[in-house]
A protein has these predicted regions:
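Active-site loop->helix "elbow" adjoining a glycine-rich segment at hydrolase catalytic centers
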Residues: 91, 119-120
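Sec-dependent N-terminal signal peptides
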Residues: 16-26
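N-terminal secretory signal peptides that target proteins for export/translocation
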Residues: 1-15
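Hydrolases whose catalytic domains are alpha/beta-hydrolase-1, hotdog thioesterase
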Residues: 124-127
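Intrinsically disordered, low-complexity regions
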Residues: 9-10, 23, 35, 165
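Patatin-like phospholipase
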Residues: 34-114, 129-393
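C-terminal motif of bacterial Sec signal peptides marking the signal peptidase cleavage site
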Residues: 29-32
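Intrinsic disorder/low-complexity signature
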Residues: 2-3, 18-19, 50
């Protein structure tokens, strides 16, 4: 049998020169088969299209304050809105899953009026919202080894494809496995009590931070609502390039088209309050907020001699950007709580956790981080009440 390697060796010099060009052309042709076909639409149509023919299923972080009031939970605990904000962090979501289980087992897990999630935090959010009875599901998601499949994408062509056979759809299948009609019904029941479940995505077309009211989507209760619920979770955790963007069908003035959504962490590493609130100097109206920020990441700078290959440089650059954005949001949120006499609680991966992942979504690493989060959640000092000293360096 003649292998491609042997065939290339037998080519004349000039033809060997053009062999790589032919390979690149083939790759480009194959990747083009996985390019999303888009329906054109205008900026005016993009302003506030409807999803599922239902109004107010999502909002935007830069909306006027009055329109965001609908996201305020009616449910309070001891007169306060208890609000859990879950950050992004990829495989480091194992920390948040373990931390919540530790709180549960220590008997000191708050009852949350509202839960928000971004990226890996979005995958945690529905289970955190529904309470300790779902802790085992989270443990399975982050420690059973199933998440390691996310790093086993469709090979080199997957990074060139946004749809089709080469695109990496493993995240979509993972979400479909864990989010079913029963979970949707449970979320809808809690939403009816006045609680709120919010998930953030980034709309690539408008470059806006989208805040999805997942409880309201759940209350629609149709098969299409379940599909949308899954799509939003998948989009929020869809790291650009690694996973394809998620197309969400919308409608404006009778015109149907699709928006492209990716990782919510592209525009917001963690959602405490929309930027409209964070940037205002006046007091936030309504019930006082008891804010809990659960950061699935380190917040202190870690020295590392970065390797010179493209992947190492890209990963280090992305992680640095996320870390800086996360620290900024922590400080903005802390100052908002100070201005309004709200309570502030923070948990994050500390510098005392020293294990390093040997590969993306390493099961052994995620198990170690889950155990670390669990012990931290059980400890008397699970939460700190001001930004970490490391973040000031």
């Amino acid at each position: 049998m003649v292998t491609p390697h042997h065939a290339c060796r037998r080519l004349p010099a000039k033809r060997r020169l053009f062999a790589p060009i032919g390979l690149i052309s083939c790759l480009a042709l194959l990747a083009s088969c996985g390019t999303l076909a888009r329906t054109p639409y205008t900026a005016a149509e993009a302003a506030r299209p409807e999803v599922l023919d239902v109004a107010a299923l999502r909002y935007f972080a830069d909306d006027p304050i009055q329109s965001l009031d609908a996201l305020r939970p009616r449910a309070t605990v001891n007169g306060e809105i208890t609000y859990l904000a879950l950050s992004g962090g990829g495989a480091d979501g194992a920390f948040g899953a373990g931390f919540l289980a530790g709180l549960s087992d220590a008997g000191k897990r708050p009852e949350f009026s509202a839960v928000s999630g971004v990226s890996t935090g979005a995958l945690i959010a529905p289970f955190a919202f529904l309470g300790p009875q779902y802790d085992q599901k989270l443990k399975e998601l982050y420690t059973s080894g199933i998440a390691s499949s996310l790093a086993q994408g469709g090979g080199p062509l997957s990074i060139l494809s946004t749809s089709g056979p080469f695109a990496n759809h493993r995240l979509e299948r993972l979400v479909d496995r864990y989010v079913d009609a029963q979970l949707l019904q449970a979320v809808a029941a809690e939403n009816a009590k006045g609680r709120r479940l919010l998930v953030v995505t980034t709309n690539l077309d408008t470059q806006r931070t989208n805040i999805w009211d997942m409880g309201r989507i759940a209350q629609v209760g149709t098969p299409d609502a379940l599909t949308l619920f899954r799509k939003v979770l998948t989009a929020s955790a869809s790291i650009p390039v690694v996973f394809p963007p998620v197309a969400i069908e919308v409608e404006a003035a009778g015109h149907h088209f699709e928006e492209l959504h990716v990782d919510g962490g592209v525009t917001s590493p963690v959602l405490t309050l929309p930027e409209t609130f964070l940037l205002r100097e006046r007091r936030v109206p309504g019930s006082p907020i008891n804010m809990y920020m659960l950061i699935n990441n380190e917040v202190d700078r870690r020295f590392e001699v970065v390797q010179g290959d493209t992947k190492s440089l890209a990963v280090r650059s992305a992680s640095t950007l996320v870390k800086v954005q996360t620290r900024s949001t922590i400080f903005d949120s802390y100052h908002l709580t100070r201005r309004n006499n709200f309570k502030f609680n923070l948990a994050y991966v500390g510098s005392d956790f020293r294990e390093q992942a040997t590969q993306d979504f390493s099961t052994s690493f995620m198990r170690a981080l889950y155990r670390y989060g669990y012990e931290k959640g059980r400890s008397p000092s699970a939460w700190v009440h001001q930004p970490p000293p490391e973040a000031l360096h």
